[in-house]
Amino acid sequence: GSSDMKWDQNYALTSDEKGNAYLYGNFVTNSRVDVKYGEAPLATHKFSQATVNAKSYALDATVVSLTDEGITYDQIVEDVKKELDAGKTYINIILAPDVDEETLEAIHIGLLEGEAKDWSINLTLIGCKKIPSRGFLHFDMLKSIVLPDVTEIGENAFSDCPGLQKVVLGNLTKVYGKGRENGIFDGCETRFIDLVLSKDQKVMNDGEAEGRYCWTADIITDYDLSNEHVSKKFLGYEFKSITCRYKFE
């Protein structure tokens, strides 16, 4: 049974309780369908040939939920490994808002035990608002990371992820750490990273909070079209491109 059906004059989209989306309709060659959570892409399907009448196309937008209070470290490792065993390189996970280091470590171990190749995994983590310090340290397998709900990030969060090519973040209010002194992207080649920020992102001002170096969102000034945006700079780093309403590259 479908939990949600959207009608258009050309197609119908239904979904089941496991997060699979089924598409019925007429699409021309090379047309594309994206399944998204807010701005975060969960699945993309490109039609290499025109669609066949009365045939449905399954779009795998499966999301793994790791929010159960009783979930163990080993269960998380196994759940992540299962995704890799199924041949997936796009992995979508729902987490609790205040995800802890242990959960992220279990995800890391699952990716390692599942033999994820370096620079191959596109990881989307839905629901988590705070990323702890060193949360994704040495996640060598990451090609992209999407954190649509995140508002606060701890020091060295993405340090030493040499293969990162794309980072999508939520509307940030606080980011800890100074570039080249435990900044969140230390050990990454940010000039090769496409950064996507929330359209509501404010300019980040550096200072201190609780004795730690901290970037705090400005109350008034929008980031989009700011001097930093135009010069592709954010949190003291320079990026390949920065998208915030508009893309500068």
Placement of each model-derived feature along the sequence:
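Short, acidic Ser/Thr/Gly-rich low-complexity loop/linker segments typical of extracellular
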Residues: 3-20
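Short Pro-Gly-centered beta-turn/loop motif in secreted/extracellular proteins
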Residues: 20-32
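Extracellular beta-sheet/turn segments enriched in Thr/Pro/Gly and aliphatic residues
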Residues: 47-65
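The feature captures the LRR N-terminal capping module
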Residues: 64-87, 101-105
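LRR N-terminal entry segment and analogous cap-like coil->beta motifs
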Residues: 85-149
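Core hydrophobic positions of leucine-rich repeats
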Residues: 106-113, 131-142, 153-163, 175-190, ...
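Conserved LRR concave beta-strand detector
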Residues: 122, 144, 152-155, 166, ...
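Feature marks extracellular polysaccharide-active and adherence modules
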Residues: 124-126, 148, 159-160, 170, ...
